[in-house]
Amino acid sequence: MKVLITGGAGFIGSHTADRLLKEGYEVRVLDSLQKPIHNSIPEYLDDRIEFIAGSATDIRAITEALQGVDYVYHLAAFQDYLPYFSRFVDVNVASTARIYEIIVRDKLPIKKIIVASSQAALGEGLYLDSRGNEVLPDTRLEENLKKGIFDLTAEDGGELFLAKTPERISNPQNPYGMSKIAEEMFALQLGKRYKIPTVAM
């Protein structure tokens, strides 16, 4: 059995590769080796890994990487705090759509796709204000962060308290989180529609 790991040179990807090798899988890694994170193939990557240098946004690289694999761990992602809004969509959403597009187009017999989401896709979570009212806070204010105020506050500036919550709808507050929830939706819905077993974690 062969596994493709996109973003496999990163921290989570490389540890996933190590575990899969230990379990007896063949591992192929697709990674763009983006600077400043990587300057070359990291020394910590096991020599048994088949490495393809390329981006998850490149249809040719993805097409090559998908050939002959049974499982896909799609871990490649873009995360930054700079306003590269379209890049979040290109890397985190469009690359996921491309993977499904190629699998459907080429009728590849993929047994399962595992997509890495993020806690950022959930948003800040549910809070209670001082009167016990539920509050879904917006983004932390930059002026508060500059003052060293990192806790979320109510609209009136009052204190908020983290609430125990039942399952709730996601409420991401930054471009990274928005792109990761969109990625989850693409993966789960395309997987369901085209009968490609898919998990978003």
Give the predicted meaning of each segment.
Residues 1-200:
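N-terminal Rossmann-like NAD(P)+-binding domain of SDR-like oxidoreductases, especially those catalyzing
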